Design a protein with these regions (language model features):
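Alpha-helix capping/hinge segments and adjacent helical runs
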Residues: 1-74, 174-201
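C-terminal amphipathic alpha-helical interaction region
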Residues: 66, 81-206
């Protein structure tokens, strides 16, 4: 999970900081609000922590291909357990997230199998989608944690502490499933079927 902490989370910080600039309009672009400084600081994180592509290559090579995807599939198995808990819930939000999580996990496993099969025999194919693989995995793992949080938020103990806060947690998890996890199958397609187009241009085309 180290590449996700260093690569995925720092890429997400850029998106968040960019939205911070955007919602301030023109004021966000100048220095008065401080938003522009946050944006610059977020950008350097994707370099200081080892560039995103380096972290993605580590995820493909040392974290996935080296053991034939066994470590990755171990995480997928843990995610499947959370799926089952969500699906068994009486909450419609939990059941909806379970479906999204299942589709994302299955897409992830397909990518893991693709990388394991091509890591040594066709490394260009395996590494061509390394950054999308990093982002796909990050989206999945974050969705898994959102699912776990949703399950906690539904418990009587949590509801007794702060019902409004817990309701917001449930809604946020549902939103994540509908708007973020739903992207994962498409990311899978670009990784397993898009390698050839990454390397298609000959050198003299540059």
């Amino acid at each position: 999970l180290v590449p996700l902490v260093k690569g995925y989370s720092t890429e997400m910080s850029i998106d968040v900081a960019s939205l911070g600039v955007q919602i301030h309009g023109g004021m966000g672009f100048i220095e008065e609000t401080g938003c522009a400084q946050y944006y610059r600081d977020a950008k350097i994180l994707t370099i200081y922590e080892g560039t995103t592509a380096i972290q993605a290559n580590d995820l493909v090579g040392r974290k996935t291909a080296r053991d034939g995807g066994q470590g990755a599939k171990s995480i997928a198995a843990q995610i499947a357990k959370t799926e089952a808990e969500l699906a068994a819930s009486s909450s419609a939000d939990a059941q909806a997230l379970a479906k999204r999580l299942k589709a994302a996990r299955e897409a992830f496993v397909e990518v893991v199998d693709f990388i394991a099969a091509n890591g040594k025999s066709n490394p260009n194919a395996a590494y061509a989608g390394s950054v999308p693989y990093l982002m796909l995995t990050g989206n999945l793992v974050a969705g898994w944690q959102m699912g776990r949080a949703l399950l906690v938020a539904l418990t009587p103990e949590a509801q007794a502490q702060d019902a409004a806060f817990m309701a917001a947690k449930v809604t946020t998890a549902r939103f994540y499933g509908d708007h973020i996890l739903s992207k994962v199958p498409g990311m899978r397609d670009s990784i397993v079927a898009g390698a050839d187009s990454v390397t298609a241009l000959p050198l003299d085309a540059f």
